[in-house]
Amino acid sequence: MYSDKYSLCFQPDATLIEQVKVMKLQLGEVIGWYNSKNSLAHLTIAEFQASEKDIERMHQQIQRCCSGFIPVETHLSSFGTYPNGTFFLEVDSIAKSQLKAYAQKLFQTLQLKNAYKCTDPHLSIGRKLDETKMQQAYALFEQPNLSFCCDLIVLRRLNMERRQFDIISHYPFLSQPIEEETQLRLF
């Protein structure tokens, strides 16, 4: 069965997307091309392979989860790195714990097999940077003071021609109470 690569992400607002785009362009002027330079700002929840049939099933599940999610005021006030060369904007601890809970709910609901699951919400500026480029990134930027209201998850499909993900669905947080499915029994 044919499958595509998909990415489920928390999507910042247009203002933050533009601010991060400017940061990525500034970094590119200093270090040249790098992984994630052209990607739209996002916080990855999971990446996975799926068929169109799988996506149709997941669409309703994601929608149902997001209808119960409450928007989260998210602050990005420091940079961080991972050993794999990722340079990122760190999510504040209060928002991070809420976004982790939302991601866990999605993992439990979707039951994604063989998926990359992000367990530490962050907003990547660059990936696969060597130590020198990492130091240049730290030197370039002052301490960030960015924020956005996280109120949307997007589903993205990898566009093989552009080698970038394209957004194919939006799932707004609706702050509605969720009725858990209950099983009725006859005695």
Question: What residues fall within each predicted segment?
Answer:
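Short proline/glycine- and acidic-rich turn/helix-capping motifs at secondary-structure junctions
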Residues: 77-84, 121, 154-164
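Basic, often amphipathic N-terminal segments
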Residues: 1-71, 93-149, 165-187
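Charge-rich, low-complexity N-terminal segments
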Residues: 86-91
